[in-house]
């Protein structure tokens, strides 16, 4: 059974210990059977749903367009994110393994944040795509060429990897003033960084990384939707407004699904608020696990091209010359 790391004496610091203790949802490790199957089901359904989206887009040349390319990247980020979460989640559920080596913890942290920021970046790119398609329909093909999309993809890759690869090295050499006990069932950067001493110089860079992605992206996304709303107000035909709005429905739902739990987590993450650890941890699970599960359903239902091709693939093919 895992034990708490040794307490650090007041006014003293130490280097990173060889292990971290993951607390997660209190009480779950004592009765893992009832939440192991839902965890496995969430992972398998997320992988199946996003894998289907990847398969359909890759095999259909008609879907090799900007919006579908960004949807392809979104499914990649969803599969990567849910896969990065599973090792420690299933370790706690199946074996009560709350202790994780520091190196494995930092590696998991990098993958979680790389794919999380990738998802945020792709959602931003998709909002720009929708804004251009609705606000500048005549110029849309000339604005979002294959070359521009390639540059956007490179920018997303640099943003995800360039910003987050230095984090484990910074955290590994920062002085720590608190025991290495993490509040979640997986390793997150804010959870690790809060254990460092206040004067640690890497904290400023860590704050910059968080704000540059998760703080900036939702503002730009909602600015894009402000432009879309302004254009739609000038459309006289109610039917045309409805059609234009429907092209944004799946994306806007995905945006709200991703950012609302994250914003709530930021708002309740204050020691003076009477929020239980169960509530905080459950909201974290919703933020990380629900989008990969729901996004494929949203896009399959709301996007006619995706839905039609999935149904065509599922229908049995007629044999011979049967009509």
Curated annotation (Swiss-Prot):
Q: Which GO terms describe its cellular component?
A: plasma membrane
- Membrane-spanning intervals of the chain: 34-54, 63-83, 108-128, 148-168, 204-224, 245-265, 281-301
UniProt key word Magnesium: no
Residue positions the entry lists as glycosylated: 11
Residue ranges, Extracellular compartment? 1-33, 84-107, 169-203, 266-280
Keywords, A to Z, come to:
Cell membrane, Disulfide bond, G-protein coupled receptor, Glycoprotein, Membrane, Olfaction, Receptor, Sensory transduction, Transducer, Transmembrane, Transmembrane helix
Q: Name one Pfam family in it.
A: 7tm_4
Q: Where in the cell is it found?
A: Cell membrane
Domain of life assignment: Eukaryota
Select a single GO molecular function from the record's annotations and give it: olfactory receptor activity
Which residue stretches are annotated as topological domain Cytoplasmic?
Answer: 55-62, 129-147, 225-244, 302-323
Tell me the disulfide pairings in this chain: 105-197
SUPFAM superfamilies this protein is in? Answer: Family A G protein-coupled receptor-like
**Lipid bilayer topology:** Multi-pass membrane protein
Residues in a coiled coil are: none
Task: Tell me the InterPro entries matching this sequence.
Answer: GPCR_Rhodpsn, GPCR_Rhodpsn_7TM, Olfact_rcpt, OR51/52/56-like
Q: What does this protein do?
A: Odorant receptor.
Homology family = Belongs to the G-protein coupled receptor 1 family.
Which named protein is this? Answer: Olfactory receptor 51S1
Q: Which organism is it from?
A: Homo sapiens (Human)
């Amino acid at each position: 059974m895992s034990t708490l790391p040794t307490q650090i004496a007041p006014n003293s610091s130490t280097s990173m210990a060889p292990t971290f203790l993951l607390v997660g949802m209190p009480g779950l490790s004592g009765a893992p059977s009832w939440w192991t199957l839902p965890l496995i089901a969430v992972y398998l359904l997320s992988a199946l749903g996003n894998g289907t989206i990847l398969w359909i887009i890759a095999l259909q040349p008609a879907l090799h367009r900007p919006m579908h390319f960004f949807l392809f990247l979104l499914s990649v980020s969803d599969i990567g994110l849910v896969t990065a979460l599973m090792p420690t989640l299933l370790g706690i559920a199946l074996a009560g393994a709350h202790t994780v080596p520091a190196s494995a913890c930092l590696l998991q942290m990098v993958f979680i944040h790389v794919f999380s920021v990738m998802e945020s970046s792709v959602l931003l790119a998709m909002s720009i795509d929708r804004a251009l398609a609705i606000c500048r329909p005549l110029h849309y093909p000339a604005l979002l060429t294959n070359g521009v999309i390639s540059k956007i993809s490179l920018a997303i890759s640099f943003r995800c990897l360039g910003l987050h690869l230095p984090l484990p090295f910074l955290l590994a050499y920062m002085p720590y003033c608190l025991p290495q006990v993490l509040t979640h069932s997986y390793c997150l950067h804010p959870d690790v960084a809060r254990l460092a001493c206040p004067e640690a110089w890497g904290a400023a860079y860590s704050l910059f990384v968080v704000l540059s992605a998760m703080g900036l992206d939702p503002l730009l996304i909602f600015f894009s939707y402000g432009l879309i709303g302004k254009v739609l107000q000038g459309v006289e035909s109610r039917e045309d407004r409805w059609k234009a709005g429907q092209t944004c429905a799946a994306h806007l739902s995905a945006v709200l699904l991703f950012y609302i739990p994250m914003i709530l987590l930021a708002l309740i993450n204050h020691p003076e608020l009477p929020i239980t650890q169960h509530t905080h941890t459950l909201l974290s699970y919703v933020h990380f696990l629900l989008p990969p599960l729901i996004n494929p359903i949203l896009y399959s239902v709301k996007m006619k091209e995706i839905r039609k091709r999935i149904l065509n693939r599922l229908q049995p093919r007629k044999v011979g010359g049967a009509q």
